[in-house]
Every structure is written in structure tokens, then in C-alpha cells.
From Swiss-Prot:
It comes from the Bacteria. Homodimer. Its EC number is 2.4.2.4. One of its GO terms (cellular component) is cytosol. The gene is deoA. This is Thymidine phosphorylase. It comes from Escherichia coli (strain K12).
Length: 440
């Protein structure tokens, strides 16, 4: 039996906590026997004193074990359980292609996703722009879809890592969100509760990233890889670029449209293709579905070329109560904005810099995201045909096409787009889409 205040005192004085102490505290968070003040105090001591790798692993596993951990053995699946997690960005629609692509190559992806957070779009919000799409199937249905289709994308239920929800709510109001051991545990508790064999992390870098600097993004990626492997899940991370909108679109329905076009081959943004392929390659290699980069890429290209990946996406949408002919007729089903009109730069030039965070917030301001949990989303608004870094823009080539609910909405968005995109006399040097791969 431990006392919460003694655990806080021990960490306050700079000592490492034992696995038993950490489990006692996390179980107390779940059971409401630990007060909000005690959660806040421990969070602040961790913020200032950090945690050793064994402490980080213990914290993550205790939070994972505070709820249900999915077990797939009874389904006798003939492939690995794999997933991807992104720290979030703008136009980051990779999950919608990656899940079906990896499933078409023999993986099983029980992806538990989130809503939009701040300037970043949420995979669940995007999928809910599809009429009827059910993000909360019951457990039996979820398992059926995984077995039959190979991929399902659902919302977090209250039974998964419940201690994280309470811990995070307290961190959010006590300035202790940006602590690497706490971020790592929060991300991984939910992911590891999926019962994975392998995980790839997409850690964003740049103006639209969660972490403000390259060094902090790198530190987070290294922490996640170390902790997840310590918890027994084969994990790698990619540091990918978020200095510009990743896809050609940003919003909800507009990104789903781009995802379908990507899968069918109608249109593929080259940077989105690079990042999606790189993440899928990691999943295939970690999941032992391919022995190396070349074999993984060949398999992935094949399921894009032969239509299998698009077919899996269509089957997932139908299995989650969306239209059965969605891939063939997406334009019929996705909501469209009242006003669709391009915005042009005031001068000619080359796109040299993009405040990606500001562009994400502009989508939120249009109604495409939430400022508070109770807000409703306008799924139709957003941007398409986004100019990329290095593009020449003028009276013919717009900065973006804005999908707005009315003229006022369009004007506000146009102002935001112009303010977020800087022009120069010559094109900037191109930056990589993937900066670094991190493994154990």
C-alpha cells in the first residue's frame, strides 16, 4: 500500500519511481481515489524532473492496463496487427490511404483515431463527412470488420486507457501538456491498448507540427520508439515535414475526396504519396510482410495499381454503415460548400514560406473544426488546389481554392490564406518530405 503524497514527494525530490508506485498512482487516477490536485502535482514534478526509460515504460503500460487491452488471438488472423499514429498536421490524410493499402498487403489495422485538436484535422471528423459512417461500432462488429475487411477506423471508447482521459484533462489546465514522458505515455497507452504487433509513428516537423522545433520533434520520436519497444511492440518513427499543407486539400469532405482520388489513381499529390508510402513501408517491414524497402514498395504499388487498396477502402466504408458504392460515386455523397472560389496573391512570386498552423486554424474558423467540444462541424468547408512551396503564383495560378459557406466566410478565409503564405522573387530550396527514420 502506498500513499499518493509520498509518491509525489519522492518524484519531487528527484528520485525514480518504481513500477509498483506508478501502477498504484495510475490505478488511483482511474478509480478516482487520487485527487485532481495530486494528479497536477505529480504531472508538474515529472515536467521538471523528467523520467528514466524504465519509469516511462511503466507509466505507459500502467495507463494502457487501466482499461481494456484488445486481444485478437481468438480470430486466428493470418497476418500481423499493425497501426500508425501521427502527431497531427494540416492536410494529413495519410490514414485513409495507408489503412487500406496495408490491409490489401495482408496486414490488419484496428485504427483507433481522434477528433481534430487545435489546428490539426481529425481523422474521425473527416470520415464523418461520409453519410452514415459509424465511428463507434460495438466491440463484436469492430472485430468482425477487422477479420473480414482488414481495416477499421473508429473512435476511442471509454474502456480504452481511461486513466489517460483524466490525466490529460488535468495536464491541459495545469500547463503540463508539453512534457515528453507524459506525451509519450498518453499517445502510446491508447495505441498499445489495440493489441499491436507493430507500430509506426509519424512525428511532424515544422510550422504545422505539434512540437515547436525539430529537436523537440526528434526527442519525442526517440522517446516513443524507446518506450514502445520497451513495452514489447516493434516500433519505428519517421520525422516528416509539416512546413506546408501535406495534401492538396485541407478540411473534411475535401480531404476524403482527395483520399479516394489517391487510391483510385485519379490524382496523387507527390508529397502526400512520399509520406504515405514511407509509412506503409515501415508497417510492412515491422509487420514482417516484406523483407526490405524494395519489396514493400513493390507490394504497395501493386495494390494501388490493381485497385485492391481502393476496393478495401470501399469495403471499410460499407462495413461502417457508409454507402456501398462510395468509391465509385464519392462526388454524389460528399457535402459540397455553397461557394467555391479561388484566392489569388496580390503580387506575382514564388511560394517561399507557409504558416501551416495558421492555415489549419483558418479551416477551424470557417467551421471545419471545433473550438470547443460542443461545436458542430461544417464538413463541406476547406481548401483545395493548395499552392506548394516553390510554386509560382500569379493572376492565373491561385494560392488555393476556398470552399466556403457564404461570401463573408470566403472573405475571412481569403484574408487568412494571404497572410499565411509568403512569396519571394525566387523559389526556395526544396525540403525533404521525410527527414529521418528512428528505430531502436
Amino acid at each position: 500500500m502506498f500513499l499518493a503524497q509520498e509518491i509525489i514527494r519522492k518524484k519531487r525530490d528527484g528520485h525514480a519511481l518504481s513500477d509498483e508506485e506508478i501502477r498504484f498512482f495510475i490505478n488511483g487516477i482511474r478509480d478516482n481515489t487520487i485527487s485532481e490536485g495530486q494528479i497536477a502535482a505529480l504531472a508538474m514534478t515529472i515536467f521538471f524532473h523528467d523520467m528514466t526509460m524504465p519509469e516511462r515504460v511503466s507509466l505507459t503500460m500502467a495507463m494502457r492496463d487501466s482499461g481494456t487491452v484488445l486481444d485478437w488471438k481468438s480470430l486466428h488472423l493470418n497476418g500481423p496487427i499493425v497501426d500508425k499514429h501521427s502527431t497531427g498536421g494540416v492536410g494529413d490524410v495519410t490514414s485513409l490511404m495507408l489503412g487500406p493499402m496495408v490491409a490489401a498487403c495482408g496486414g490488419y489495422i484496428p485504427m483507433i483515431s481522434g477528433r481534430g485538436l487545435g489546428h490539426t484535422g481529425g481523422t474521425l471528423d473527416k470520415l464523418e463527412s461520409i453519410p452514415g459512417f459509424d465511428i463507434f461500432p460495438d466491440d463484436n462488429r469492430f472485430r468482425e470488420i477487422i477479420k473480414d475487411v482488414g481495416v477499421a477506423i473508429i473512435g476511442q471508447t471509454s474502456s480504452l486507457a481511461p486513466a489517460d482521459k483524466r490525466f490529460y484533462a488535468t495536464r491541459d489546465i495545469t500547463a503540463t501538456v508539453d512534457s515528453i514522458p507524459l506525451i509519450t505515455a498518453s499517445i502510446l497507452a491508447k495505441k498499445l491498448a489495440e493489441g499491436l504487433d507493430a507500430l509506426v509513428m509519424d512525428v511532424k516537423v515544422g510550422s504545422g507540427a505539434f512540437m515547436p522545433t525539430y529537436e523537440l520533434s526528434e526527442a519525442l520520436a526517440e522517446a516513443i520508439v524507446g518506450v514502445a519497444n520497451g513495452a514489447g511492440v516493434r516500433t519505428t518513427a519517421l520525422l516528416t515535414d509539416m512546413n506546408q499543407v501535406l495534401a492538396s486539400s485541407a478540411g473534411n469532405a475535401v480531404e476524403v475526396r482527395e483520399a479516394v482520388q489517391f487510391l483510385t489513381g485519379e490524382y496523387r499529390n507527390p508529397r502526400l504519396f512520399d509520406v504515405t508510402m514511407a509509412l506503409c513501408v515501415e508497417m510492412l517491414i515491422s509487420g514482417k510482410l516484406a523483407k526490405d524497402d524494395a519489396e514493400a514498395r513493390a507490394k504497395l504499388q501493386a495494390v494501388l495499381d490493381n485497385g485492391k487498396a481502393a476496393e478495401v477502402f470501399g469495403r471499410m466504408v460499407a462495413a461502417q454503415k457508409g454507402p456501398t458504392d462510395f468509391v465509385e460515386n464519392y462526388a454524389k455523397y460528399l457535402p459540397t460548400a455553397m461557394l467555391t472560389k479561388a484566392v489569388y496573391a496580390d503580387t506575382e512570386g514564388f511560394v517561399s514560406e507557409m504558416d501551416t498552423r495558421a492555415l489549419g486554424m483558418a479551416v477551424v474558423a470557417m467551421g471545419g473544426g471545433r473550438r470547443q467540444a460542443s461545436d458542430t462541424i461544417d464538413y463541406s468547408v476547406g481548401f483545395t488546389d493548395m499552392a506548394r512551396l516553390g510554386d509560382q503564383v500569379d493572376g492565373q495560378r491561385p494560392l488555393a481554392v476556398i470552399h466556403a459557406k457564404d461570401e463573408n466566410n470566403w472573405q475571412e478565409a481569403a484574408k487568412a490564406v494571404k497572410a499565411a503564405i509568403k512569396l519571394a522573387d525566387k523559389a526556395p530550396e526544396s525540403t525533404p518530405t521525410v527527414y529521418r527514420r528512428i528505430s531502436e
